[in-house]
Amino acid sequence: MDYKKEGKEILEGIVIAIVLYLVISLTLSYALKVDNPVAVVISGSMEPVYYRGDIIVIKGTDPASIQVGDIVVYKRPYQDIPIVHRAINIIEEDGALYFVTKGDNNPFEDSYFENGKKFPGVPDYAIMGKSVMKIPKLGYVTIFFKRLIGVRI
């Protein structure tokens, strides 16, 4: 058994996987008009629509086109993890749009705070886009690596 050759083949496989991931991610990012076109579901808040470990594909969306019932993806200013919840109400206040969101499996609506101020919902500028597709359970790979090396992939 040639360990040097096997090690080289494993390294080549890892490099190819990383390059493929980057090419696919950049292509999706451009095509879907969003910086981060994929997210991993890490909680059960959207069951039975999405389960922990599902990967969702995000499409950048003009917030004005979002309707009640759409599943939106947003980020809070103090968290790097995208939140995937359903828009259950839309509030227009002083010319700004706010989306009241809630996980299908959660008992309460989401709260949104920024700089100590509570907003009536998720502000339009925090919306990344809408969920347009899911890949069941594939996200467990990234959850595993995150736990293994302590880094978000």
Task: Pin down the residues of each PLM region.
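Short coil-to-beta transition motif at edge beta-strands of beta-rich domains
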Residues: A64-R76
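Glycine-centered tight beta-turn/hairpin loop motif at sheet-sheet or coil-to-beta transitions
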Residues: Y78-D80
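Acidic/glycine-rich C-terminal interaction modules and beta/coil loop segments
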Residues: A31, D35-I42, A64, P82-I153
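Soluble, non-transmembrane catalytic domains of enzymes that act on hydrophobic metabolites at membranes
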Residues: M1-D2, V68-I71, N89
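Short, glycine/charged-enriched secondary-structure capping and boundary segments
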Residues: D54, V72, N115-G116
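Protein maturation boundaries and topogenic segments
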Residues: M1-S65, P136, Y140-I153
